[in-house]
């Protein structure tokens, strides 16, 4: 029995519409943003790294097969509409890279060149994706009830999601933050080091708590390549770290 490769976008698997992918051109890398500055009287240019990468266009060469012409047209139309109805970045995975995922937007494609009595065709499906290849392993939370360390297996700084119980000084990597005491010592303060937001869950909603943290140097924690210290100061009883490892 033939095994076909596929992609899944926001829970929609391409094989549900009879669409398979070949995988070519799925492995491209994003462009690093670098400003080149020339100085009068100086040979060459100075490269100033902007600390970020551009979005990347991910193209899946794909094909579809059906029992008849009407079925073929319906499958293509169904998948196109399902993909196009997502207006924000959604999770994108494929069977070529099962340990990774991207965040992307459907951009174009699914214009099939039909063959075999209009019951099969080939086409490209194009997504505009954020530059990171997120590792599935980076979604696994690690819990600390005492000081320890966490190891970043990649070469890129990760910006974790923290869930902190207690108050006091917390050191993660080279950054130190002070968690201000709250009414309940058992309440959990969530800190997103990517969006630089802090909040508590109250009832069914989130309440902003950015004023509950003080960052030394105004920097939020990052997990650098290799081992990173996790130091729980007096009063911090538990820290749960979702590391969000990524590569390009």
Model-identified regions with their sequence ranges:
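Polar/acidic, low-complexity leader/linker segments enriched in S/T/G and N/D
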Residues: 1-40
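Oligomerization/assembly interface segments of phage tail-like spikes and tubes
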Residues: 45-70, 119-133, 228
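Short beta-strand and beta-hairpin "edge-sheet" elements
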Residues: 89-133, 139
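Short, acidic/charged, Gly/Pro-enriched secondary-structure junctions
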Residues: 8, 12-13, 63-108
């Amino acid at each position: 029995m033939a095994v076909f490769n596929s992609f899944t976008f926001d829970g929609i698997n391409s094989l549900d519409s009879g669409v398979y992918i070949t995988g070519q051109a799925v492995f491209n890398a994003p462009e690093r943003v670098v400003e080149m500055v020339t100085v009068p009287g100086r040979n060459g240019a100075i490269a100033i790294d902007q600390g970020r990468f551009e979005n990347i266009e991910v193209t899946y060469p794909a094909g579809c097969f059906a029992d008849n012409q009407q079925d073929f047209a319906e499958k293509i139309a169904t998948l196109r509409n399902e993909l196009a109805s997502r207006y924000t970045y959604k999770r994108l995975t494929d069977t070529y890279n099962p340990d990774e995922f991207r965040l992307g937007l459907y951009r174009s494609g699914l214009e099939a060149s039909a063959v075999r009595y209009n019951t099969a065709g080939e086409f490209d499906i194009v997504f505009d994706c954020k530059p990171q290849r997120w590792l599935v392993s980076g979604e696994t939370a690690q819990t600390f009830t005492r000081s320890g360390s966490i190891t970043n297996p990649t070469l890129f700084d990760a910006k974790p999601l923290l869930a902190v119980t207690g108050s006091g000084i917390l050191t993660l990597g080279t950054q130190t933050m002070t968690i201000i005491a709250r009414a309940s010592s058992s309440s959990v303060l969530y800190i997103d080091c990517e969006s630089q937001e802090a909040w508590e869950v109250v009832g069914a909603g989130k309440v902003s708590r950015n004023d509950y943290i003080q960052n030394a140097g105004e920097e939020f924690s990052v997990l650098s390549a290799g081992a990173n210290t996790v130091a729980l100061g007096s009063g911090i009883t538990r820290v749960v770290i979702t590391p969000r490892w990524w590569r390009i």
